Amino acid sequence: MKQSLLSVLTKKSLRLLAALFLVVTSVFSLPQAAQAFPIYAQQAYDSPREANGRIVCANCHLAAKPTQVEVPQAVLPDTVFEAVIKIPYDTDAQQVLGSGDLGPLNVGAVLMLPDGFQIAPDDRIPEKMKEEINGVFYQKYKPDTDNVIVVGPLSGADHQEIIFPVLSPDPATDPNIHFGKYSVHAGGNRGRGQIYPTGDKTNVNAVTSPAAGLVSSVSENSVTITTNDGQTVTESIPAGLEVVVSEGQAVADGAPLSSDPNVGGFGQKDTEIVLQSGTRIKWLMVFFSAIMISQTLLVLKKKQVEKVQAAEMNF
């Protein structure tokens, strides 16, 4: 009987230890908020570009800001070239951080290349280009998407231009690649977003009145409103935001109660690139050369005929 009881207790203890081990393992294996911050989109979307053409970064960075992308008009197979995403903004601007303090803006970018294009291996990147991209870490959007690259967050003051060293594919070694014109999609953001992936608002939003009424009290971190139907509602004002209403002021539904702290935003740009065949270029040059030679010979022949005709007329 004692042995049976001891056996039961031993089994229960082992099960308890196993369950505890699984709980601890799962806690440490979950992505932490600080680690997940640069890759919110990667966790939530299979592709950074929606069916309507919009890049998903715009779902959290609501303000529209300009972004530019520069790529060569055409590239040869198996060559390294620069793709540049420009994210301009006023470097004197400061954003509201999560703590409510003011701080410098950071930037991030996504580059969607045609199939087969990818970030160039380190041994293929020229030394001059390495100096220009020093400190930039390039990450695949998904493990199996070599042609979709994300970067950031980076210091905005030092990275208003982000250079991507790109290696073009070679149709001679990959039968799935063909010469032709392809689309390139780029997106760039500066500053913090207004929406978390959960749908909750960040503190980079103006606080608005939930209903029409009169402001009954104002403090540094809250505004109380007596609505037109006699109810009282209190809106919290996150740290770093400035209250723009005063007691006794009438406010409409949706009217701002605080300043708008957002100084950032997102922008996207589409362009095209041609994967050009070197053989085609050579034959094109031969064709143009043949035309030029033919035209030259025709001109010479015409002058010769004119001389003969002039001689016959004089005779």
Swiss-Prot record:
Instruction: Tell me, in one coarse class, where this protein mainly resides.
Output: membrane
Q: How does it assemble?
A: The 4 large subunits of the cytochrome b6-f complex are cytochrome b6, subunit IV (17 kDa polypeptide, PetD), cytochrome f and the Rieske protein, while the 4 small subunits are PetG, PetL, PetM and PetN. The complex functions as a dimer.
Domain of life, per UniProt, equals: Bacteria
> One biological process GO term for this chain?
photosynthesis
Membrane-topology annotation of the record: Single-pass membrane protein
Give the transmembrane region(s).
281-301
Per UniProt, the keywords (alphabetical) are: Electron transport, Heme, Iron, Membrane, Metal-binding, Photosynthesis, Signal, Thylakoid, Transmembrane, Transmembrane helix, Transport
Which gene name does the record give? petA
**Which GO MF terms does the UniProt record name?**
electron transfer activity; heme binding; iron ion binding
Has the keyword Iron been applied to this entry? yes
> Where does this protein reside within or beyond the cell?
Cellular thylakoid membrane
User: Where along this sequence does the record place binding of heme?
Assistant: 37, 57, 60-61
Its protein name is Cytochrome f
PROSITE patterns attached to this UniProt entry:
CYTF
The cofactor required is:
heme
What lineage is this protein's organism placed in? Bacteria, Bacillati, Cyanobacteriota, Cyanophyceae, Acaryochloridales
